């Protein structure tokens, strides 16, 4: 790596390695070298220098993702280093910048997006600051600055991916809606919400600048029904939205909603009309919503072909599958999740027609708990064989034997771009007659030694085919989710409170009956 760094970057590293000297020398450093000083200080985790560099930033723009990405002076990509020490220093430096004399302020735009949360931090301290923590830090800093007596001046436009829960809701609202002049004006290209009430969600999204929002994730413990979704889309409006994720049961009817005698669903049709107004929408995730027979109504009006579609556990029927196989979206799909449906046994012709239509674009396919058994493997191989762009195949929770998996792996070696396979624990490793789909307890009770032997055999299949580039794994309880990991304590408390409320309501109902 040393031979790939430029002399300019080596010099920057040498300077930031001496924090006191670096801070004292900043005023004499050429403006075009500040980006190198920033990356060098971030790489070496010299938080004092990072703060000082931001405080005196001489350029009109600061774009974190671009600065940490590969460059001619330093090819290493640091965008997966969400180092707590460096990010805290960065935001403190941003505050220092707006607090200094107006004549010294140059910064107009601070783009804090473009970094990735990963499971293992490569920074020296090994301590990450996740998306929720970054949101909290920025919101608190904005609130503190709002209380400062500042000279008038143009505010710095801050772009940030926000993650809002009950725990940081108040601070975020204050940051987005300052009572007076605000030196930092937060804009939000991406927004994730969890553990909020529907009214809180509606309120904070109205403040977050929905007209510029590109990605909206409403997940887990935001209890929405179809009435809330319709209200959200109709009243707030997201003209530039490209990606939308809705939580479990988001398309369930409201408690007082009465369906029409002819079986039509005006509420769903209204939601579909609102979605059709989003001319840039290409990603839609509505997993764990009951959408039996409703996919044509929901997806039919969309004006733009979808590239990402998650319909896991949506209780799809033949009407839905037939629509998917023949709709305009099929030929554009890059990411598709149809987990929780017995596709091969119930809808073989439409499912494989869908795969054929998507074969030129499909990169990631997830078929977890789809009832795929040994007798289906031949058909599955035929269906996947045209998918030459497939990079990831995930099919956990299917009752397949070691023999069937070996056959499937042999065929998958023919897919030139495949890089990742998530395969189920072979049914040979479970007691005979084990039921599928499995709960978490049953799933975890298997013969580990036998699994290790079979997994080694499967890796040998790849090795013989010269496909060491394919990574294989069996993540029984799902892949790493940095957002859930970061907020697990708050989510647990939220669930306990919800359970307590449900028990109190049940007890109250029993007393009324008595």
UniProtKB/Swiss-Prot annotation:
Mind telling me what this protein is named?
Answer: Leucine-rich repeat-containing protein 14B
SUPFAM superfamilies, from UniProt?
Answer: RNI-like
This protein's UniProt keywords: Leucine-rich repeat, Repeat
Asked if Repeat is a keyword of the record, the answer is yes
UniProt LRR repeat ranges: 104-141, 185-209, 238-277, 278-302, 303-334, 335-350, 359-386, 387-411
> Could you tell me which PANTHER family the record lists for this protein?
LEUCINE-RICH REPEAT-CONTAINING PROTEIN 14B (PTHR14224:SF27), SIMILAR TO PREFERENTIALLY EXPRESSED ANTIGEN IN MELANOMA-LIKE 3 (PTHR14224)
- The transmembrane segments are none
* Family, similarity comment: Belongs to the PRAME family. LRRC14 subfamily.
Has UniProt tagged this entry with the keyword Transmembrane?
no
Q: Which organism is it from?
A: Homo sapiens (Human)
């Amino acid at each position: 790596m040393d031979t790939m760094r430029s002399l300019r970057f080596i010099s920057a590293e040498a300077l930031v390695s001496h924090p006191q000297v670096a801070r004292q020398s900043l005023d004499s450093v050429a403006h075009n070298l500040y980006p190198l000083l920033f990356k060098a200080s971030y790489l070496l985790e010299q938080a004092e220098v990072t703060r000082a560099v931001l405080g005196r930033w001489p350029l009109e723009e600061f774009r974190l993702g671009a600065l940490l990405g590969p460059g001619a002076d330093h090819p290493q990509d640091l965008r997966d280093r969400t180092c707590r020490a460096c990010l805290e220093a960065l935001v403190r430096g941003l505050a220092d910048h707006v607090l200094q004399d107006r004549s010294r302020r140059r910064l107009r735009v601070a783009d804090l997006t473009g970094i990735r949360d990963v499971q293992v931090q490569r920074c020296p301290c090994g301590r990450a600051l996740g998306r929720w923590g970054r949101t909290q830090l920025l919101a608190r800093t904005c609130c503190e600055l709002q209380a400062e007596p500042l000279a008038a001046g143009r505010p710095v436009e801050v772009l940030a991916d926000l993650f809002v829960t009950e725990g940081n809701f108040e601070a975020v609202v204050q940051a987005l809606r300052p009572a007076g002049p605000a030196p930092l004006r937060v804009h939000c290209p991406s927004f994730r919400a969890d553990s909020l009430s529907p009214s809180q969600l509606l309120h904070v999204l109205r403040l977050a600048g929905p007209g510029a929002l590109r990605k909206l994730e409403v997940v887990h413990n935001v209890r929405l029904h179809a009435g809330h979704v319709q209200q959200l889309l109709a009243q707030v409006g997201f003209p530039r939205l490209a990606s939308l994720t809705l939580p479990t049961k988001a398309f369930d009817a409201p408690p007082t909603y009465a369906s029409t005698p002819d079986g039509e669903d005006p509420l769903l049709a209204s939601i579909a009309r609102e979605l059709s107004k989003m001319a840039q929408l290409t990603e839609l995730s509505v997993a764990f919503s009951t959408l039996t027979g409703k996919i044509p109504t929901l997806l039919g009006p969309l004006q733009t072909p979808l590239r990402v579609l998650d319909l896991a556990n949506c209780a799809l029927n033949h009407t839905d599958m037939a629509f998917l196989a023949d709709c305009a979206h099929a030929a554009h799909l890059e990411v598709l999740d149809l987990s929780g449906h017995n596709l091969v046994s119930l809808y073989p012709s439409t499912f494989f027609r869908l795969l054929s239509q998507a074969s030129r674009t499909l990169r990631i396919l997830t078929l977890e708990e789809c009832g795929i058994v040994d007798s289906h493997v031949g058909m599955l191989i035929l269906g996947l064989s045209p998918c030459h762009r497939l990079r990831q195949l995930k099919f956990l929770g299917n009752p397949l034997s070691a023999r069937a998996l070996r056959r499937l792996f042999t065929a998958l070696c023919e897919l030139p771009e495949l890089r990742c396979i998530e395969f189920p624990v072979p049914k040979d490793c479970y007691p005979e007659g084990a039921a599928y789909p499995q709960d978490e307890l049953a799933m975890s009770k298997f013969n580990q030694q036998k699994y290790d032997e079979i997994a080694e055999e499967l890796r040998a299949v790849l090795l013989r085919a010269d496909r060491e580039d394919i990574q294989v794994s069996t993540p029984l309880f799902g892949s790493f989710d940095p957002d859930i990991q970061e907020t697990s304590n708050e989510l647990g408390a939220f669930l306990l409170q919800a359970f307590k409320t449900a028990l109190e309501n049940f007890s109250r109902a029993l007393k009324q009956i008595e």
